[in-house]
Amino acid sequence: MQLQRRFRMAALLLGLGCALLTLCGLAAYAQGRFYSRGRYDYSDAQSQEKAEFYWSRLRYTSSGGQSNFGFGFGYGGWAGWSRDYPKADRQFLMALKRLTRIQMRPVEQIVDLDSDEIFNYPWVYAVQVANWTFTDAQAKRLREYLLKGGFLMVDDFHGTADWDRFMVGMRQVLPDRPVEDLGDNDEIFHVLYDLGERFQVPGEQYVNTGRTYEKDGYVPKWRAIRDEKGRIIVAICHNMHLGDAWEWADMPEYPENFASMAYRIGLNYIVYGMTH
């Protein structure tokens, strides 16, 4: 009988603890930015700082119906667009500041396709793009953004099924523009760093599994969509996870060569986008 009472008391305390954690999580979410590994704040002054370059991350509605933080298709229960956010963004911005002369805002910017605000930002990054969905109005706005000089970099989707779902959305946006494999001599790989020789950049899972690939994405694909003048308007990083490499560059167990390659690719893409 005494053992049963102890068991019931332990179960009650466990339930109260879970409820308390849930309430704390909701409070943190209401007070500031919250993501899968904690809270990340920045000052109002930083978020309003004027610059020539803004790191912009695309917030989209996923196939699970999620656009804000919340449970749905994504990583760790978070909406897919927010994977690695915001640590990957912040760490990449530190590298951009140190290694280029681009005058940039030190914090990230979230952009949506439901307003014309996206036209204020020259370069946009999107992840988990196998899960994105667009309304006709959103697809039209993204198409106009790209054809008027914008640049989109997509990352962190893997294998055949992810590619097919990504292309459903991409064909809404640019139905008449072909996708091409980029050659090693393409200008985008040489505007800042010479990246004629590249390799697959895995996510954090490499530390525990030793695998550089996810799903059936065994071979990295460097692809692009160009406008009628030949300018790359969509840079496609398929079968790799550059954002994870940026995020975990300070993790001793994550190999430096992967992080270094990921940063160089991102920096090249930004310099290309800002000069074309």
Which stretches of residues belong to each language-model region?
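Extracytoplasmic/secreted envelope proteins and their assembly/folding machinery
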Residues: 89-93, 139, 143, 163-167, ...
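Bacterial N-terminal signal peptides
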Residues: 11-25
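Surface-exposed patches in mature extracellular/periplasmic domains of secreted proteins
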Residues: 102-112, 154-159, 177-185
